[in-house]
């Protein structure tokens, strides 16, 4: 009994921490800024939201993303230009001033603060702002899920993490050298989280949720063989053989020949 109470207490504290997490829904202060990078760039403040298209500049969206993920506080104009636009290093200081001016005008629509400031060390995010990102929140939720004492709480935490992921980090810059490693890290983490969630939902016989999350994840990562495995398994358990057959066809389109054969074998089908 004491152990059960301890588990319940730990899970309650975990959920309390989750509910207090900084997100677009609970921004209150004018100093709070939430930046979403999964899929497209979005910036939230207490006064509204800026979408990537509102910035009207691929360079500005790349600048903001680079400053967020670089792990360094401030960067010189030349350093930024060399990282993002190595083929265009003509007058980087002037070009950066122009970008910052345009950003200031646009960000001014949803905040009286400056988002990026110039310092003796270079350009950086305004230290007076409290900035949180979706990928940081994703990390926090995955860490909490790994420590959850109950399957139910683990499932809820994984669901919340997975719901944040709408595609690769700044998908409009997908494949650019400065972003590849960082984006791949979260793409792989997302696939791992999805596969764990589907496994847990199957154990709970929550087939409707399993179908929902598997289908959504396969729209984002159609090459995830485990996503097809759990979805087809769930459909077969529910007697939905025609839908399962349709998923087999989709799997055949997106998986390698070897992956498809392994999928069929693991599900006990010949797939001839």
Regions found by a protein language model. Give the residues of each.
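Cytosolic linker/terminal segments flanking nucleotidyl-cyclase catalytic modules
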Residues: 1-34, 240-243, 248-272
């Amino acid at each position: 009994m004491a152990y059960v109470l301890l588990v319940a207490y730990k899970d309650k504290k975990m959920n309390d921490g989750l509910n207090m997490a900084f997100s677009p829904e609970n921004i209150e202060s004018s100093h709070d800024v939430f930046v979403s990078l999964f899929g497209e760039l979005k910036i939230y403040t207490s006064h509204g939201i800026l979408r990537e298209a509102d910035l009207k500049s691929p360079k500005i969206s790349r600048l903001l993303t680079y400053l967020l993920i670089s792990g360094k506080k401030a960067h010189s104009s030349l350093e930024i230009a060399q990282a993002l636009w190595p083929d265009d290093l003509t007058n980087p200081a002037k070009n950066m001033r122009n970008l910052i001016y345009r950003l200031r005008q646009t960000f001014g629509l949803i905040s009286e603060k400056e988002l990026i400031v110039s310092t003796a060390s270079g350009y950086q995010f305004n230290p007076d702002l409290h900035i949180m990102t979706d990928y940081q929140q994703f990390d926090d939720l995955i860490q909490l899920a790994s420590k959850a004492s109950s399957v139910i709480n683990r499932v809820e935490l994984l669901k919340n993490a997975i719901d944040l992921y709408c595609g690769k980090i700044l998908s409009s810059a997908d494949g650019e050298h400065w972003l590849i490693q960082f984006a791949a890290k979260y793409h792989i983490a997302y696939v791992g989280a999805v596969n764990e969630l589907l496994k847990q939902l199957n154990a709970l016989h929550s087939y409707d949720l399993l179908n929902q999350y598997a289908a959504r994840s396969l729209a984002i990562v159609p090459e995830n063989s485990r996503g097809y495995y759990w979805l087809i398994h769930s459909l077969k358990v529910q007697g939905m053989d025609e839908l399962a057959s349709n998923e087999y066809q989709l799997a055949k389109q997106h998986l390698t020949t070897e992956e498809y054969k392994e999928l069929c074998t693991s599900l006990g089908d010949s797939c001839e």
